[in-house]
Design a protein with these regions (language model features):
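Extended, low-hydrophobicity, polar/charged segments
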Residues: 1-167
Length: 167
């Protein structure tokens, strides 16, 4: 789980960087399918996240549009990794301080050891509103794609920007 002060630190970072955002508190959601109500309440593009580990032991956090189709076998070639599989929830908790359902690119705030490589789908970077969790699945915040990139760079995790989705 996220450290008690992680969300506070995250919002302090957003404020320091003057990131404009919308925030919606809601019931817990664990899957993209469960988040339909949020999609109607918040304009913009909604996301899904994959926490992956390659056979070399490297961890990857991949964020794409919620409706994107992702071929994990093809993804490894796009990001230059070895064979990929889904990372275990224990590793996600240890490295990113979050649990399944709360996955977000903003969780890199907790990866102080730099063990996770963040990958953002190219589509997200040009969007005016990208909706993501703020380290918990009971809220969603919307910020611009360019601000998302600025924030994760400020957190020491410059993302790899790749055409992740198939098609």
């Amino acid at each position: 789980m996220a450290a008690p002060d992680s969300e506070t630190a995250l919002f302090e970072t957003l404020d320091r960087l003057h990131v404009k955002r919308q925030k919606l508190e809601h019931k817990p959601v664990f899957t993209v399918a469960e988040s339909d109500e949020i999609h109607h309440a918040l304009p913009g593009i909604h996301t899904k996240n994959l926490f992956l580990k390659d056979e070399g032991g490297a961890f990857w956090l991949v964020t794409t549009p919620a409706d994107a189709t992702i071929d994990v076998k093809a993804l490894r070639h796009k990001i230059g990794s070895k064979r990929l599989s889904f990372g275990k929830s224990e590793a996600m908790a240890e490295l990113l301080g979050i649990e399944p359902g709360s996955v977000t690119p903003l969780a890199v705030i907790n990866d102080t050891g730099g063990k996770v490589t963040l990958v953002l789908d190219t589509t997200l970077t040009g969007e005016t509103m990208v909706n993501i969790h703020p380290l918990r699945n009971t809220a969603t915040i919307g910020l611009s794609g360019s601000d998302l990139v600025r924030v994760v760079v400020d957190l020491g995790h410059p993302p790899r920007i790749v055409d992740v989705a198939d098609g």
